Amino acid sequence: MGRVVVEVMLKPEILDPQGQAVLNALPRLGFDGFSSVRQGKRFELSVDGEVTDEVLAQVREAATTLLSNPVIEDVVAVVGAP
């Protein structure tokens, strides 16, 4: 059984209000030294059999179609990542 991890992040030019809220809260909680926070989504997909190039292409297509908004988000799919 193979596994693919899909990470969905806002494109760099898109403002991230949730990330900004976390960044603003960090010093209030005693965590200093952070200059930026970006929030995203992570999906772990288990596939039957080995992860081939065809399977990875299908995962990327599904991620672009279903798991993300390609207008404002970027998708990265990695085979077998922890």
Regions found by a protein language model. Name each.
Residues M1-P82:
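Non-catalytic terminal accessory/regulatory regions of metabolic enzymes
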